[in-house]
UniProtKB/Swiss-Prot annotation:
Organism classification: Bacteria, Pseudomonadati, Pseudomonadota, Alphaproteobacteria, Hyphomicrobiales
Cysteine pairs bridged by disulfides in the record: none
Gene expressing this chain: kdpA
Membrane topology: Multi-pass membrane protein
Protein name: Potassium-transporting ATPase potassium-binding subunit
Family: Belongs to the KdpA family.
NCBIfam families listed in its UniProt record: kdpA
Alphabetized HAMAP family for the sequence: KdpA
GO function terms (MF aspect): P-type potassium transmembrane transporter activity; potassium ion binding
Transmembrane segments: 5-25, 64-84, 136-156, 178-198, 254-274, 285-305, 330-350, 357-379, 421-441, 488-508, 527-547
Source taxon at top rank: Bacteria
Length: 571
């Protein structure tokens, strides 16, 4: 570990914190319907879109109506994306003559991109046409990110409103998230990325002759526009197979830093939106503090583990940190920080190969996802996931003091707790259930490239990433098989919608309740005690649930490495 590394981490945290209030203020105005700087230009476009779609922007929906509209929208989006991928060979903007995507891979990819996961069992430059990348994937990157923001805003309204059955309009929230938040930032962001050296072209791939006389095909495409939304929207799917490790996706240290900031920007700012909309900004800062505590702990462990390197190599007197799988233009600190950021925020983009991290260094991204992607989390998804944990934490606090649990003047009762636990428990069910299945079936065991505990970790990481809607991978797993394409897709769909629906049900139940005035016995939820309780609940539920699986994978791998033991295929 170096002073330069810690300086990078400190600067990163400072920049993200500096964006929380201004971006939170702006998004609050957007979703409360107030005038913004962009309203003179965008408001007429917004009204025109509503007229064209036959939507009454003033008509709000109950939680069931909101959820129904959301699900219908995603079914349609899934079918359209699946059709684009299957018909790719017959569609235009295909200069490399890419063939149609296989049915099982198209199913997996469609599920992946509508759920904001962006798990990729293919190499983008060798599988997809420009049309599929733009109209199919980039389009869904905007829609899935906007959906997460919309659900978070609906849940905030559930806490903020009283004695009402409505949560707003899904169509309005979706439109405003794209039109006022995602698109304006992405336009400027794309220009910055082009300036940094990322291609943005519809020209064909280039056939080049190397200095040694060999032939090489240089893949190009509309890369910058996809990178902008994949980072800002915490989607994570790469235009190229190497993702953000590819110099055409992430060419410089500056582009790397800005991409990391953009991953956290909206998710962190939504905590401020929460505080503003419920009338007490301290509530938002308390939630952000809990997120920050978990994030800093993860960064410290991951950086320490990668800086110290493999214990097996250290036993031979080799030091200098673990540089395997890392780009030389990014040092160990930037690679470890990116890994923690991308898995804390359910982004899944990578600038280094997580499969090449040390056992403990690779365990941190795994744990980040297993905690429910609530450490900032995906845009919107992180906040509504954290608020689900808040409901459980408040319920636990009420049990400890023998009082009816209350949060922001709303009583937390049986329905809210049941829905919260449904949203929490569906993730380990997918992560651990499918991992167990893959480890006992020959088709599952054929996937990992490594034996022993690391091979188990590759399987566990895949299903954890899918259910947590992250999309990153221990890439030693060969996942492009019917078994993995199908099971990973199911994990992604359940991990997305079986959290969204309980979150909306909680919002509907809370919005219908009257606000109870605070009393002397009300548990304060804006201080260090609440932050500690919330972090404790997250660690207990997440940590204890997954500890046996972690013990079989990265923990055993680390202990075996410290004892000088390695595993070959077949061991």
């Amino acid at each position: 570990m170096t002073l330069n590394g810690w300086t990078q981490i400190t600067l990163y945290g400072a920049v993200v914190l500096a964006l929380v209030k201004p971006l939170g203020w702006y998004m609050t105005r957007v979703f409360t319907g107030e005038r913004t700087l962009l309203s003179p230009v965008l408001a007429p476009i917004e009204r025109g879109l509503y007229r064209a779609a036959g939507i009454d922007a003033r008509q709000e929906q109950t939680w069931l109506g909101y959820a129904g509209a959301l699900l219908l929208f995603h079914v349609f989006g899934f079918l359209v994306l699946y059709a684009i991928l299957r018909l790719q060979a017959a569609l235009p903007l295909n200069p490399a003559d890419q063939a149609a995507v296989a049915p099982d891979l198209a199913f997996n990819t469609s599920a992946s991109f509508i759920t904001n996961t962006n798990w990729q069992n293919y190499g983008g430059e060798s599988t997809l046409s420009y049309l599929s990348q733009m109209l199919g994937l980039t389009h869904q990157n905007f829609l899935s990110a906007a959906t997460g923001i919309a659900v978070a805003v609906a849940l905030i309204r559930g806490f903020a409103r009283a004695s009402t059955r409505t949560l707003g309009s899904f169509w309005v929230d979706l439109t405003r998230a794209i039109l006022y938040v995602l698109l304006p930032i992405c336009i400027l962001y794309t220009l910055f990325l082009v300036w940094q050296g990322i291609p943005q072209t519809l020209g064909a791939y280039i056939d080049a002759t190397t200095l040694e006389g060999g032939k090489q095909t240089i893949a190009l495409g509309p890369v910058a526009s996809q990178v902008a939304i994949k980072m800002l929207g915490t989607n994570g799917g790469g235009f190229f197979n190497a993702n953000a490790a590819h110099p055409f996706e992430n060419p410089t240290a500056l582009s790397n830093f800005v991409q990391m900031v953009s991953i956290f920007a909206i998710g962190a700012a939504l905590t401020n939106v929460f505080g503003r909309m419920v009338g007490d900004e301290r509530q938002g800062w308390a939630i952000l503090a809990a997120m920050g505590a978990l994030f800093l702990a993860g960064v410290a462990v991951a950086y320490w583990a990668e800086a110290n390197g493999s214990p097996v190599l250290a036993s031979f007197g080799l030091s200098g940190g673990n540089l395997e799988g890392k780009e030389v233009r990014f040092d160990i600190a930037a690679s470890a920080l990116f890994a923690v950021v991308t898995t804390a925020a359910s982004c899944g983009a990578v600038n280094a190969m997580h499969d090449s991290f040390t056992a403990l260094g690779g365990m941190i991204p795994l744990v980040n996802m297993q905690l429910g992607e609530v450490i900032i989390g995906g845009v919107g998804a992180g906040l509504y996931g954290m608020l689900i944990f808040v409901v459980v934490a408040i319920f636990v606090a009420g049990l400890m003091v023998g009082r009816t649990p209350e949060y922001l003047g709303k009583k937390i009762e049986t329905k809210e707790v049941k829905m919260a636990m449904l949203g929490i428990l569906c993730l380990p069910l997918m992560m651990l259930g499918f991992t167990a299945l893959a480890t006992v079936l020959p088709t599952g065991l054929a996937g990992p490239a490594n034996a022993g505990p690391h091979g188990f970790s590759e399987i566990l990481y895949a299903y954890t990433s899918a259910a947590a809607n992250n999309g990153s991978a221990f890439a030693g797993l060969s996942g492009n098989t019917p078994f993995y394409n199908a099971t990973l897709a199911v994990g992604m769909l359940v991990g997305r919608f079986f959290v969204i629906i309980p979150a909306l049900a909680i919002a509907g139940a809370l919005a219908a309740k009257k606000t109870v005035p605070a009393s002397a016995g009300t548990f304060p939820t804006d201080g260090a005690l609440f932050v500690g309780l919330l972090v404790g609940v997250i660690l207990i539920i997440g940590g204890l649930t997954f500890f046996p699986a972690l013990a079989l994978g990265p923990v055993v791998e680390h202990l075996a490495g410290a004892a000088g033991q390695t595993f070959a295929m077949g061991d």
